[in-house]
A protein has these predicted regions:
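Alpha-helical adaptor scaffolds
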Residues: 154, 332-346, 353-401
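Solenoid-like repeat scaffolds
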Residues: 65-71, 103-110, 142-149, 178-186, ...
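Residue-level recognition of tetratricopeptide repeat
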Residues: 84, 123, 162, 197, ...
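Generic helix N-cap/helix-start motif at coil->alpha-helix transitions
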Residues: 72-81, 111-118, 149-159, 184-194, ...
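N-terminal leader/linker segments that initiate helical-solenoid repeat arrays
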Residues: 2-10, 32-143, 151-155, 201, ...
Length: 464
């Protein structure tokens, strides 16, 4: 062979190798798994045909014995090059025919040549979205064992594992990923996360947790980032096992590293479920401060916890924020809760305003009854009488006689003695029907007092 011939041969070899490299490095579709339950954690799988090499190379390389493999003939180079040209031209059927024709002469080929032809054939099937066909061809590639380059073997093993997962052949996905791990140079955490996802699909939560914990350990040892979806998957797995202490720990990591509404609200929910009410309140308050509260239950739960902790002013502010955010409807029940919070916070004017709105919406007179007491304490006797009358008109009261007493007292303070006496007479009548002796006595004392006061005023008027 002349020097010129050798140069041309090397050029052809180089061109064919470049084509082969391109074929092996075309991206696979990124596969995401949406998990059910907690606001939706997911795992992103490695997305390139060359991803296996990248995953392994994140760690320091360890020395391995160089593998000797048979070389590719010029005829195979040409077939691979022709196949790649047809792929680039989007002629997948033509590319398929080209490689299939080449494989008809497979008896002439060594293991490496057979592997490279089946590798391209697998890629063509993949582009045609025939994943079963792609898997069949890629499995032929790895079956050539030690007679193909290590890079081709490990890359194809990784691809077979991923495609098996996509095809829901979980046993094969695990099998080929385990083989890949045994051959890879210091693999990173990603294969462990992949296997955890597979075990999750198989409902083997114990093994899924084991793989997730191992993956996180590897990532932390190398100083690489553990993604939000990976922590979320681990949280979900602990949740499935009802391992609440670990659910709390992983959620604490999530709110620290990825402070989002879903993580704060879940953390608060688990704290509440486990009886840690103060921690539940602190979590919801943190979410409130960050502007993460969105739902009615978010605001009402926090307000309720604040009321339990005897901080009614903050509870009222939370409910007001819920109204402003239009997360809470202004119904009588919520308005009554807001009114009670303002009342306990000594914000009487705010309480009265809210109770007035709530009383109109309520089906019974209980809120009007509460208003009558507030107006009595605030020396607003006209409004006290109106509220007491509203309570009696709507009914549904626990003790009707008590409302008559309040109404009578306000009427007395307005110097309406006749009306006040009528209210106390009605009070005594209702108290007798319910055998309420204490209120019978109170109302009787008021009637006697008003009669004496009326007589005294008559005498004063006569003397004048």
């Amino acid at each position: 062979m002349t020097d010129t011939t050798k140069i041309k041969q090397r050029q052809r070899d180089g061109a064919a190798k470049t084509l082969l490299s391109k074929a092996r490095n075309v991206s696979l579709t990124v596969v995401t798994l949406a998990l059910l339950g907690l606001a939706s954690p997911f795992v992103e799988l490695a997305g390139n045909l060359g991803a296996a090499e990248a995953v392994a190379q994140e760690a320091p390389e360890k020395k391995q014995k160089t593998r000797r493999v048979p070389s590719l003939s010029e005829a195979v180079y040409k077939k691979l090059g022709a196949g790649q040209e047809l792929i680039d031209a989007k002629d997948l059927d033509g590319a398929l025919l080209e490689i299939q024709e080449a494989l008809e002469r497979s008896r002439r080929y060594n293991e490496n040549e057979i592997a490279n032809l089946h590798n391209m054939l697998g890629y063509i099937y993949y582009l045609k979205e025939d994943y079963n066909g792609a898997l069949r061809e890629y499995k032929i590639v790895v079956s050539q064992g030690e007679k193909i380059p290590e890079g081709l073997e490990t890359t194809t093993l990784y691809t077979v594992a991923q495609l098996s997962y996509v095809q829901e052949n979980y046993d094969d996905a695990l099998k080929y990923m385990e083989i890949w791990i045994s051959k890879a140079q210091n693999p990173s955490a990603d294969p462990r996360f992949f296997m955890a996802t597979v075990y999750y699909q198989m409902k083997d939560f114990d093994k899924a947790i084991e793989q997730m914990e191992l993956g996180i350990q590897i990532a932390e040892e190398r100083g690489t980032t553990v993604k939000e979806q990976q922590w979320s998957l681990l949280t979900f797995l602990y949740f499935e096992k009802e391992d609440w202490p670990n659910v709390i720990e992983t959620l604490k990591i999530l709110v620290e590293k990825f402070p989002k509404r879903e993580h704060w609200v879940r953390l608060a929910g688990v704290y509440g479920q486990e009886g840690y009410e103060k921690e539940q309140m602190y979590s919801l308050e943190a979410a409130y401060t960050a502007g993460f509260l969105e739902k009615k239950s978010d605001f009402t739960n926090l307000a309720g916890l604040l009321m339990q902790e005897e901080v009614p002013y903050r509870a009222a502010k939370v409910l007001v924020a819920g109204f402003k955010a239009e997360a809470i409807e202004r119904d009588s029940t919520i308005l009554q809760s807001l009114g009670q919070a303002w009342q306990l916070a000594q914000e009487v004017d705010n309480a009265i305003e809210v109770f007035e709105e709530a009383a109109k919406l309520a089906d019974d007179g209980k809120i009007y009854e509460r208003l009558s007491y507030l107006y009595l304490e605030d020396d607003q006797y006209d409004r006290c009488v109106d509220s007491a009358s509203g309570a009696l008109d709507k009914g549904g009261l626990r003790k009707e006689q008590s409302v008559h007493i309040v109404k009578g007292m306000c009427q007395y303070n307005l110097d309406k003695l006749t009306a006040a006496r009528d209210s106390f007479v009605q009070c005594r009548r209702v108290a007798r029907r319910s055998d309420d002796k204490p209120n019978q006595r109170v109302c009787g004392q008021w009637i006697t007092f008003i009669d004496r006061e009326t007589e005294r005023l008559k005498q004063l008027a006569a003397a004048g």
